[in-house]
Amino acid sequence: MATKKAGGSSRNGRDSAGRRLGVKKSDGQYVIPGNIIVRQRGTKIHPGINVGLGKDHTIFSLIEGRVEFLTKQSHKIVNVKEIANV
């Protein structure tokens, strides 16, 4: 006879790695074409002027300039403002 009861195996104890989502460039930061500004699931933040939207809803810069976040009619929007050449 067993002197100890068999220990049950736990059904927990696993977790997936984080997906590294979120804002990658903040308001006023300098970007070049192709720089990722936001990684997201769905369009929590909408693309504005001079930014592109990838098939995974990643927002990226199309031009060289500064990032600008704003809210219009309860939509968060991100633009890239061109820097004037002096």
From Swiss-Prot:
It comes from the Bacteria. GO terms for cellular component: ribonucleoprotein complex; ribosome. Residues 1-26 are annotated as: Disordered. InterPro entries: Ribosomal_bL27, Ribosomal_bL27_CS. Transmembrane segments: none annotated. Signal peptide: none annotated. The keyword Amino-acid biosynthesis does not apply. SUPFAM superfamilies: Ribosomal L27 protein-like. The keyword Transferase does not apply. GO terms for biological process: translation. GO terms for molecular function: structural constituent of ribosome. Keywords: Ribonucleoprotein, Ribosomal protein. Belongs to the bacterial ribosomal protein bL27 family. NCBIfam families: L27. PANTHER family: LARGE RIBOSOMAL SUBUNIT PROTEIN BL27M, RIBOSOMAL PROTEIN L27. This is Large ribosomal subunit protein bL27. The gene is rpmA.
